[in-house]
Amino acid sequence: MDSITTAASVVAAGLAVGLGAIGPGIGQGTAAGGAVEGIARQPEAEGKIRGTLLLSFAFMESLTIYGLVVALVLLFANPFAG
Amino acid sequence: MGPLPFALPFAELEVGQHLYWQIGNLKIHGQVFMTSWLLIGALLALVVVGTRKMERDPRGVQNLLEFLWDYIRDLARTQIGEKAYRDWMPFIGTLFLFIFVSNWGGALVPWKLIHLPSGELGAPTADINTTVALALLVSLAYFYAGLSRKGFRYFEYYVYPTPIMLPFKIVEDFTKPLSLSFRLFGNILADELVVAVLVFLVPLILPVPVMFLGLFTSAIQALIFATLAAYYIGEAVEEHH
């Protein structure tokens, strides 16, 4: 792999995870805020809210994980390595 | 690129290195087969032990199995619906148990003690082939569920509620297995990577809470995979009026 490809791959891998973390981060913050509000309003529903919150967290997290998969492909199985 | 330059013997991580077995023209990843057979064996042994000498008042392993059965039934019933869930409970339950045992087995069993000539033993779900196979099984399952229950009326689902939805629904058939497989694969591999990197930086104590977090997320991922599989099947067998 020549040095330009290596450099570009490493930068792209960093960007893939870094940029990919922005959206889910905002989303998880909103979701957690909503859940806290819900628990404050209705403390007896805490168990149900927590379950739903964790499930939706995992969905949001998987968006960042897609970025991570791209980063891992660039680092360990680079198709442009030639 | 080769393995990461980790010096500690138990923190080595070899991404993209496999123990190849040649069968005919196929090259298969031997380490995945070994771990998954072992874990499937353990799961089968647990079920056999738990269902021998069953009692009215469940105790020990039987109690655990009945709890799992209840859990999976509730999962299937809420997603698929009262009418069709019985047919699909075994499938959903198998998916859930296999993924759960694979994720935890990969993290809890000290596989590093067994040395392989190439590659390393670990969670079978940290290999993209396993997760893609599981996701394609889910695709087949929901097509079969819809077609067998509704016949060609299944395709009404593609134009429901309006025909404008048709292209999106077709694209969805491809994105469903894609996202299912990448989500599981990425999460499990990410857990292993995070622990490996932390062990490399701070070998003592600090990685332990992260390992617990990894156990937690991998249990949630098993639940998510099973829930989504059930949801897709439920979507396919649902009646539109």
Curated annotation (Swiss-Prot), chain A:
Recorded topology in the membrane: Multi-pass membrane protein
Broad class of where this protein is predominantly found: membrane
Site feature location: Reversibly protonated during proton transport: E61
Record's subcellular location: Cellular thylakoid membrane
Entry GO MF terms: lipid binding; proton-transporting ATP synthase activity, rotational mechanism
Keywords in alphabetical order: ATP synthesis, CF(0), Hydrogen ion transport, Ion transport, Lipid-binding, Membrane, Thylakoid, Transmembrane, Transmembrane helix, Transport
GO cellular component: plasma membrane-derived thylakoid membrane; proton-transporting ATP synthase complex; proton-transporting two-sector ATPase complex, proton-transporting domain
TM ranges: 7-27, 57-77
Matches recorded under InterPro entries: ATP_synth_csu_bac/chlpt (IPR005953), ATP_synth_F0_csu (IPR000454), ATP_synth_F0_csu_DDCD_BS (IPR020537), ATP_synth_F0_csu_sf (IPR038662), ATPase_proteolipid_c-like_dom (IPR002379), F/V-ATP_Csub_sf (IPR035921)
Record-stated family: Belongs to the ATPase C chain family.
Record note on quaternary structure: F-type ATPases have 2 components, F(1) - the catalytic core - and F(0) - the membrane proton channel. F(1) has five subunits: alpha(3), beta(3), gamma(1), delta(1), epsilon(1). F(0) has four main subunits: a(1), b(1), b'(1) and c(10-14). The alpha and beta chains form an alternating ring which encloses part of the gamma chain. F(1) is attached to F(0) by a central stalk formed by the gamma and epsilon chains, while a peripheral stalk is formed by the delta, b and b' chains.
Job description of the protein: F(1)F(0) ATP synthase produces ATP from ADP in the presence of a proton or sodium gradient. F-type ATPases consist of two structural domains, F(1) containing the extramembraneous catalytic core and F(0) containing the membrane proton channel, linked together by a central stalk and a peripheral stalk. During catalysis, ATP synthesis in the catalytic domain of F(1) is coupled via a rotary mechanism of the central stalk subunits to proton translocation. Key component of the F(0) channel; it plays a direct role in translocation across the membrane. A homomeric c-ring of between 10-14 subunits forms the central stalk rotor element with the F(1) delta and epsilon subunits.
The protein's name: ATP synthase subunit c
Organism: Prochlorococcus marinus (strain MIT 9313)
